[in-house]
């Protein structure tokens, strides 16, 4: 038998074929939309060579280390870290609520009367 079954990749490639005919060649069909834009964009310095953004000036070494640590985590480990932070935030909210209630009962939050 000289024939073989078509593989799934052959079917995929066949489904991606386009038989659309363009009227003109690409440069004629898609001329530069706004003349001079390419030169204008090229005139700006690369963001890599320019000075770092303002927000990066405030980042400390510990922050960079934390970003590297978070970047090296797997998806599951990152989700576990996020869950831990959510639980911590919830617990801090409960503690704050408890302390505010305590302060209210002790009348330490009232404004002094004049």
Swiss-Prot record:
Keywords: Phosphoprotein. One of its GO terms (biological process) is regulation of DNA-templated transcription. The modification Phosphoserine is found at residues 26, 51. It comes from the Eukaryota. The keyword Nucleus does not apply. The keyword Phosphoprotein applies. InterPro entries: DREAM_LIN52. One of its GO terms (cellular component) is DRM complex. Belongs to the lin-52 family. Component of the DREAM complex (also named LINC complex) at least composed of E2F4, E2F5, LIN9, LIN37, LIN52, LIN54, MYBL1, MYBL2, RBL1, RBL2, RBBP4, TFDP1 and TFDP2. The complex exists in quiescent cells where it represses cell cycle-dependent genes. It dissociates in S phase when LIN9, LIN37, LIN52 and LIN54 form a subcomplex that binds to MYBL2. This is Protein lin-52 homolog. It comes from Pongo abelii. The lineage of its organism: Eukaryota, Metazoa, Chordata, Craniata, Vertebrata. The gene is LIN52.
């Amino acid at each position: 038998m000289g024939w073989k079954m078509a593989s799934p990749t052959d079917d995929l490639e066949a489904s991606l074929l386009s038989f659309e005919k363009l009227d003109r060649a690409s440069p004629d069909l898609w001329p530069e939309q706004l003349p001079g834009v390419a030169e204008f964009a090229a005139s700006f310095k690369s963001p890599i060579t320019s000075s770092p953004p303002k927000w990066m000036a405030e980042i400390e070494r510990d922050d960079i280390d934390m970003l590297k640590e978070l970047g090296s985590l797997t998806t599951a480990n990152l989700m576990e870290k996020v869950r831990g932070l959510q639980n911590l935030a919830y617990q801090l909210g409960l503690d704050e609520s408890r302390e505010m209630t305590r302060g209210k009962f002790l009348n330490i939050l009232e404004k002094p009367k004049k």
